[in-house]
Amino acid sequence: MYSSVMAQTLKLSHSPKALASLAEQFKALGDETRLGLMMAVAASEDAEACVCDLTPDTGLAQSTVSHHLKLLVDSGLLNRTQRGKWAYYSLTASAKKLLK
């Protein structure tokens, strides 16, 4: 009975595409490094950060941090803006809702 009610609720409130997107966001946030990067971006000055600012605190290689940031961008949690040599990251509207 519970699964039937749950299935009806999901059908009424969210499309399969919306559920897949939400699942992808939770999957991305399920990694401690990515969650930490999201929190660091949120706490940074002007609510945006460059990979060059985020790398030193992680203890990871810049390429690894960039990989994690790309996954967060692909999942719709971060925006990426290129400025010259560096990419800057900021939270999307959906990420701001999740972190409230």
Write out the residue ranges for each language-model feature.
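N-terminal leader segment of winged-helix/HTH proteins
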Residues: 1-29, 74-77, 91, 97-99
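N-terminal helix-turn-helix DNA-binding core of bacterial DNA-binding proteins
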Residues: 20, 24-61, 83, 87-94
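Short, charge- and proline-biased low-complexity linear segments
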Residues: 43, 99-100
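Alpha-helical residues within the helix-turn-helix
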Residues: 56, 67, 73-74
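Short coil turns linking two alpha-helices in DNA-binding domains
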Residues: 61, 66-68
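Conserved phosphate-binding and hydrolysis motifs of nucleotide-dependent enzymes
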Residues: 68, 76, 84
